[in-house]
Amino acid sequence: TRESFRHTLEEVVKCQPARLSIFNYAHLPSRFAGQHKIKEELLPAPAEKLALLQETIEFLTAAGYHYIGMDHFALPDDELAVAQRAGKLHRNFQGYTTQGDCDLLGLGVSSISMMGDAYSQNQKDLKTYYAQVESLGHAQWKGCSLNRDDLIRREVIKRLICDFSLNFAAVEQAHGLVFKEYFAEDLKLLQTFIDDGLVRMTEEGLEVVSTGQLLIRNIC
């Protein structure tokens, strides 16, 4: 309930952790057998989860935390908060980070690696994982290499997620394109969020307002 979750937040804040990562529970009983014990009808509805997130943001910011975005909070002097204020924050599939240009090597079942412009995932089944390591010397199951369009979109998404704003000129200079022409179809799709007051668009760029930040995944 909202009351019990608020109590949890109150207890956590007493410990003053430098960072907090708070995200939705993913109910996937078909993949995780132990989740069959959880009654799905007792889980909060999407609207309730959104309300929980809003109240969490309000509570933690009142307690002195900076809302980094999506699922992360940090104290003002934490390096994530410092990097965001300086426009140097990054995000990968592990979360927010100050290390933007590092390769990530995933170790273990189902882990994901990011090496240069390529992503790969290890085998998800333990027996298959071990068998493939023995036979091939690696556990890679699938992967993909990013093309130019993927790289451009990755950078645009990263800036929106990290800064909640986007400068058209910066993207144009970095990638040699005209933003409103290259993203013409995407801007049409974004119009719904603009009409709802969640995103502001000017001649210079985009800004995601505070209420829109709750839906940054959808906006991206």
Language-model features, listed with the residues they occupy:
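A short, conserved structural fragment
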Residues: 194-204
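Short amphipathic alpha-helical interaction segments
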Residues: 179-194
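C-terminal scaffold of the Radical SAM
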Residues: 1-180
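Minor-groove-contacting beta-hairpin "wing" of winged helix-turn-helix DNA-binding domains
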Residues: 205-209
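Short, amphipathic alpha-helical interaction segments positioned at domain boundaries
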Residues: 211-220
